[in-house]
Amino acid sequence: MIGNRVINLLIVATLALAGQTVLALELGQDCVNPVGEAGKCVLFRECQPLVDIYNKPVNTPDDTQFLTESRCGLYERKTLVCCAGVRSKGKTSLPESPNCGVQLTDRVIGGQPTKIDEFPWTALIEYEKPNGRFGFHCGGSVINERYILTAAHCITSIPRGWKVHRVRLGEWDLSSTTDQEDDFYADAPIDLDIEKIIVHPGYNLQDKSHHNDIALIRFNREINYSSTISAICLPLSNSLRNRKHAGLSSYAAGWGKTETASASQKKLKVELTVVDVKDCSPAYQRNGISLDSTQMCAGGIRGKDTCSGDSGGPLMRQMSGSWYLIGVVSFGPQKCGAPGVPGVYTNVAEYVDWIKDNIY
């Protein structure tokens, strides 16, 4: 094991790569991290999320930039960093970067099955059917130890006699009881009973524009994070909420229908370009659908889209080393993956206050 002094020298060298001026804050002072989230200026070794990023087998340029820009001062020649995401007492909190949106590997290549530990916040919603059978027909995203975020239509627009039954986390291959990739064996997925479901009060089943298509599911217990189960970040700060994503690359992941119209057994991912909602509105207006700023669009390239089995699942972007949930899969063209018609997503940034008001 490398001595503390050597580790500190390595950290200082890594954090100095960008050559930027370090804020001269004192130990314990309030600070703001690179993505605009509030934190405390602490010793590097006391900020476990940053230590975890530093200790990853391979650091991406975003990782290095985030580490560099997290510096906030020096204390007795030791590096201080702005550490965000301290959990508030008495109420379930939402994690902030770098306590969320981190996966052990950065191997995103669009249009392929995921690796076993990619996007560990993806969830499956299981339904109980009248014939005594069960099935997974919607997705969601882990946002902390007690909740997933999903689409309202996954709760209210389901066939007669169906009931939302449980939530599964840590899944990768539905055809296997033990997920394995190369020499890595994942822990068994967990099935969680549901304590409460909160559908946005503004969602109207009869509204074909699907405004306010967002819901929360609360587990009956807290979960423990692992390499295959963790939370994705939400855009909590004003700077993140106001960020424009149009024209930029994003990713969706889930077990939905493929271009062959059959559900995938393994978790899939697809790279999608975000489209300004004003630019994709005309494609839907002819069908009497009116989109607004609480929605966003992505995709529109033949064969690259999210399909019905992915409803409620995540649309995400990696920013400053962490993955952020920017959209929830809502609806799309009648023919999935139709060219020129992007899919529609609930714009998560518009619902951060609602989410914060409804978790406990």
Curated annotation (Swiss-Prot):
Cellular compartments per GO CC: extracellular space
GO BP annotation list: innate immune response; proteolysis
Pfam family, one: Trypsin
List of catalytic residues: 153 (charge relay system), 213 (charge relay system), 311 (charge relay system)
Its EC number(s): 3.4.21.-
Tissue: In females, expressed in fat body, cuticle, thorax and ovaries.
Chief subcellular location: secreted
Quaternary assembly: Interacts with SRPN2 in the hemolymph of immune-challenged female mosquitoes; the interaction results in CLIPB4 inhibition.
UniProt xrefs under PANTHER family: TRYPTASE-RELATED
This protein's name: CLIP domain-containing serine protease B4
Protein source organism: Anopheles gambiae
